[in-house]
Amino acid sequence: AGSIAAYSVGITDIDPIRYNLIFERFLNPERVSMPDFDVDFCYERRQEVIDYVNRKYGADHVAQIVTFGTMAARNAIRDVGRVMGIPYQQVDAVAKQVPMELKMTLKRALDVSTELKRMYDTDPQVTELIDTALKVEGMPRHASTHAAGVVITPEPTDYYLPLATNDGLPVTQFNMTEIEELGLLKMDFLGLRTLTVIRDAEIAVQKHDPEFSVQKLDYDDPDTYRMLGQGDTEGVFQLESSGMKQVLVGLQPQNLEDVIALISLYRPGPMDSIPTYLRNRHEPDKISYKTPQLAHILDVTNGCIVYQEQVMQIFRELAGFSFGQADNVRRAMSKKKHAVMEAEREHFVHGCTDPGNECPGCVANGISEKVANEIYDEMSSFASYAFNKSHAACYAYVAFQTAYLKCHYPSEFMAALLTSVLDNTDKVIEYSGEC
């Protein structure tokens, strides 16, 4: 979405200049790895896109991508128990002592589960079971086809990659990461149900208003923003959770920038900044900046750092980094590479004279060392949570389309929405309450 070229030829619909989307966040000369290229389509027509790519580039130049499922803690215990011939009930009793938490490991489970540790210490068979499971935990357990990934190659795919077939279709035997390391073009063709809802609603509206098109919506429509400010967002993409409704009521969004910011903030981590964001929105005279140079970068988000692109702009405008340098530091911050972060702190504050990495630094640009370090600390703490504004803008664009349809064409929108969830009884009941 940050590409002016993509916008100009109609690949994307969001004006990157109007919303200050930085192309270098996607691709720049100093970026080592290839960027992700994710494209959402109506989920009923995703296969048409894959068929088109096969025709365009040749079936032998296109393959879907393998993904490997690995043995999680509980599965490792169950699989090892099966091989050891231990009755299933006994193995299951051990496996169930592993807490059901995201990224739980056997080592950590032994630390936090008193009962699992007791079984491990007192039962030799359980000791052998878990010791063996520890050795296979995390190993590949099965292969499947990635839900969206497709690789397109200049020469026939088997020139670069080992292939297998799944349901008659070629599938790489290298995973996403390995394909990226080879420098090959990886595309994610994603099916998004909401785009199908928008299409179906548009077709229904066109039956009585042939000139209607979602490509011609007024993205400054006050009625739509009034509806959002009332929290009437059941069925609206990205904005229908109860918590998001409360934030919408508190914010009273006035434009798409507000929606972009909310989608970026309403996630674990950045969510803690929402009270400050709302307070600054309604009391702008109380917003203060550590240095005047920050004002035009952060004014669109009420004085808060919200986007990765803002981190890059701060590096560029306060310390003279190139966008490529700025993106590399942002990546180091997001991955908490402390050695790199400390080296770059010195460059941010005092500049760098190394060939190819020259920058004047904040002090040379009239910012005190103390203030420069405070700004760097603030960026470091938030960079791991900051969201890609280009992604958020895409989400906000689709969110507005669904909100506009609900506001101005509620019958057509709700019919399309209900049709899309016919296989989900709870959702049908929930959305029927809106009709």
Go through each PLM region and give its residues.
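Alpha-helical scaffold/interaction cores of sigma-54-like transcription cofactors
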Residues: A1-C435
